[in-house]
Regions:
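Peripheral terminal and linker regions in Fe-S/redox and tRNA-modifying enzymes
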Residues: 1-180
Length: 180
């Protein structure tokens, strides 16, 4: 957890702790627990991230073991924030009227399969799944992105995903990926 989810702040003695939220989901019980953790360890502040995780700032380095234990007690101690297994997805056809493809279903399966990737270079890749052209998951700036589209197969329009590779996530999204 500490390797993937904790980063040193500029201010000595403090760290940023990312809470990995699989597919951006957490229960109301977990949300209340995170509020208690934030009040206790960060002065009552937290942020959401573009990767659909939560970020605790101003965590004293001395408090990191306690923060981890508190997160573990509610099932929020998953490592892998910002790695290839930390797949971002929009709601897709689950709840969005514009959804063409089931982006959450794809993201869940990718997440399950990519958790075993241990090569350092591959672990740093970003994967994002958008269920339609609106790009809510920002697939176009991911190293590996999926865009929900439809195709005609045997005379019927059916959902598919278009693969997009090579987007630049860092440096203010300096490049869009190329559709394959």
């Amino acid at each position: 957890w500490r390797t993937d989810n904790v980063r040193a702040q500029k201010q000595p003695g403090y760290s940023l702790a990312t809470i990995t939220l699989p597919l951006g989901d957490l229960t109301s019980h977990q949300a209340r627990a995170v509020a208690v953790i934030a009040r206790r360890f960060t002065g009552d502040t937290m942020r959401t991230t573009v990767d659909q995780n939560l970020l605790l700032r101003w965590v004293s380095d001395a408090d990191l073991p306690e923060v981890h234990a508190a997160l573990a007690s509610v099932g929020l101690d998953e490592a892998g924030a910002g790695t290839i297994a930390d797949v971002t997805a929009c709601p897709g056809t689950d709840t969005c009227k514009l959804g063409i493809s089931a982006s959450r279903g794809l993201a869940g399966e990718l997440r399950r399969r990519l958790r075993v990737v241990q090569a350092a270079a591959a672990r740093e890749l970003h994967v994002k799944c958008s269920g339609c052209y609106n790009s809510c998951a920002q697939h176009h700036v991911a190293d590996i992105g999926f865009l929900g589209v439809s195709r005609v197969v045997a005379g019927r329009r059916v959902p598919h995903f278009q693969l997009v590779v090579g987007g630049q996530w860092s440096e203010n999204a300096g490049a869009f990926g190329l559709a394959i």
